[in-house]
Amino acid sequence: MTTSEYGSRRSDDDQWDIVSGVGYTALLVAGWRALDTVGPQPLAPDEYAKYFIAASGDAYLNDQLAHPPTSVDETAFPRLYGVQTRFFDDFFRSAAAAGTKQAVIVAAGLDSRAYRLEWPSGTTVFEIDLPQVLEFKARVLQRHGVEPKARRNEVAADLRTDWPATLHAAGFEPGQPSAWSVEGLLPYLTADAQDALFARIDDLCAPGSRIATGALGSRLDHDQLVALEQTHPGVNLSGDVNFSALTYDDKTNPAQWLAARGWVVEPVRNTLELEAGYGMTPPAVDVRLDAIMHSEYIVATKP
């Protein structure tokens, strides 16, 4: 399969693994994290991301790591996903510092925070994803002798099924505060699926719980992205993936949904605002990309 085939049209009951369909986006993002890590100023170094790329055998991503891009345009997506990674890293650090002992990573993919971050003693990280994705991640990291820095409990479940029951079985305590990340997932959900996901999370959250959600491309116009690439010959920003074919539009804004149910929502930020907060000056390509992708990052607390 070529990278251009990964952006095939979705169906509501489609299936995937780490090298196909929506699952490939997790591998692609891991590749961008790996590229940002070897860049000049990584915001959230992920030394483990390269292991997933090597194990996948994906020709495109392995070639990228063997010959890392260097121009400000070519490194746009690695840089922007570095910003996104830092946002969610900081969210979990803040929650842990406040005493939250349960972290839930929804659609965990190749997220390595259970292994990367310094978690306080007694913290449990619950990773929700398909069994084949979780198995791939654990197998690759075990092969390299990497151990989690918190209790890591796998929640092997499809989000379209009764995953809260599986989460309970994995030891989750709904009576205790928890911190939830929904990173990069919402564009791939239908409106009904997004509402159902947030309703279930709301039901599982005790007072004092927190949620962070966001995506670099909350809405994405693939044709505009292609047009931007054409103005920079030789630059492949998207990895040949048609994200528009994998995503759904016309959904309730997450900040509005959470606020309507009593959550206290912090000011919503986009990628450019995050970059500025991290002491960066967004280059022109980042400004153009954000106009195309409409990034937004949200943190909310349940009173």
From Swiss-Prot:
EC number(s) recorded for this UniProt protein: 2.1.1.-
Residues involved in S-adenosyl-L-methionine binding: 129, 158-159
SS bonds (residue pairs): none
A GO molecular-function descriptor: methyltransferase activity
Group of enzyme by EC: transferase
A Pfam family assignment: LCM
UniProt cross-references to InterPro entries, sorted A to Z: Ppm1/Ppm2/Tcmp, SAM-dependent_MTases_sf, SAM_mthyl_Trfase_ML2640-like
UniProt keyword terms in alphabetical order: Methyltransferase, S-adenosyl-L-methionine, Transferase
Superkingdom in the source lineage: Bacteria
One GO-annotated biological process of the protein: methylation
Record bears the keyword Methyltransferase: yes
Family named by the database record: Belongs to the UPF0677 family.
Function comment: Exhibits S-adenosyl-L-methionine-dependent methyltransferase activity.
Protein name: Putative S-adenosyl-L-methionine-dependent methyltransferase MMAR_2791
Biological classification of the source: Bacteria, Bacillati, Actinomycetota, Actinomycetes, Mycobacteriales
